[in-house]
């Protein structure tokens, strides 16, 4: 996995020495792993000698990953919200063990002036995002206790936030059923997010809308997001996999 984690949107093709450096593995070990991953078609070697994630890997991971099923279930609902709002809309899932969220789908605003940090297939901290906070608020008491038991460190700014301060925010978010987050990671933005739950009431995802503060009708966006999350929750509850 250390080899596969070397690749991202900005580093889609890497040489063997780059992989060794980025994975912090000895050159001989990195080279051996690259050869093995190429032999089983998880990596592809290009004409310039560099490597990248193979089409076969993408096909295998997408076909077998339940997140792709969730993404497809949500796509039309997200699209409807995007068409109505004309703003950035996203779907994220929690990774409470890592205290992060993972963005699995997004629709961008038609204009590019709004600054957005949440990218498709990228992670952000659970405590600095509207989607992260609303999912944590709807997590089990045991999960909340575990996640907030130690201070949080912002992966972007390095700022430390007391876990108890985050925990204190959650009851109000849960009572309201959503969060309106003004500022946050991008000071000029306002985000609205709500949870998506399965048939057992477990939080599976969160849907969020982000716009520039002052250019958003919070009440209308909140109503739209809550309605969309209810629709997606009902879809999941009818799906035997959830």
Q: What is the predicted function of each stretch?
A:
Residues 163-176, 180, 185-188, 203-242:
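Juxtadomain coupling helices with adjacent low-complexity linkers
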Residues 155-156, 187:
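Intrinsically disordered, low-complexity polar/acidic regions
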Residues 52-150:
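Amphipathic alpha-helical effector-binding/dimerization core
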Residues 1-67, 233-234, 238:
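N-terminal helix-turn-helix
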